[in-house]
Amino acid sequence: MPKHAKSARLLRVEGTIQREISEILVKEVSDPRLKDVTITGIDMTPDFSIAYVYWTIYSDLASSGEKADAGLQAAKGLIKRQLARKMTTFKIPDLIFKRDTAIEYGDHIEQLIAKLNHESK
């Protein structure tokens, strides 16, 4: 969780960037490595200079995540250019892609609970 209190403007810009990047991935990026990538959140610095873009992929293969990360890095320039076209902000932030492992962690916890329940029967 960020240490700073987020302004309404910062929250609004984060939401806009999340929607726009999601749309860009679906409509304008043709890289098959990004087919199942979902943008789960954006966390921007208070000065709007950096946007941490959290993503996940719905695949059990570890290689899919690595390929998706490589695909996002390859598409970063295109995504940033398209953001610049679509947004009215003065400056487009630098994009740093980070894999969101919360869903995978939640699945792991559910599996552990199911295993414990099965063993206790």
Swiss-Prot record:
Its main location: cytoplasm. The keyword Disulfide bond does not apply. InterPro entries: KH_dom-like_a/b, RbfA, RbfA_dom_sf. One of its GO terms (cellular component) is cytosol. It is found in: Cytoplasm. GO terms for biological process: maturation of SSU-rRNA. It comes from the Bacteria. Belongs to the RbfA family. HAMAP family: RbfA. Monomer. Binds 30S ribosomal subunits, but not 50S ribosomal subunits or 70S ribosomes. This is Ribosome-binding factor A. It comes from Oenococcus oeni (strain ATCC BAA-331 / PSU-1). The gene is rbfA.
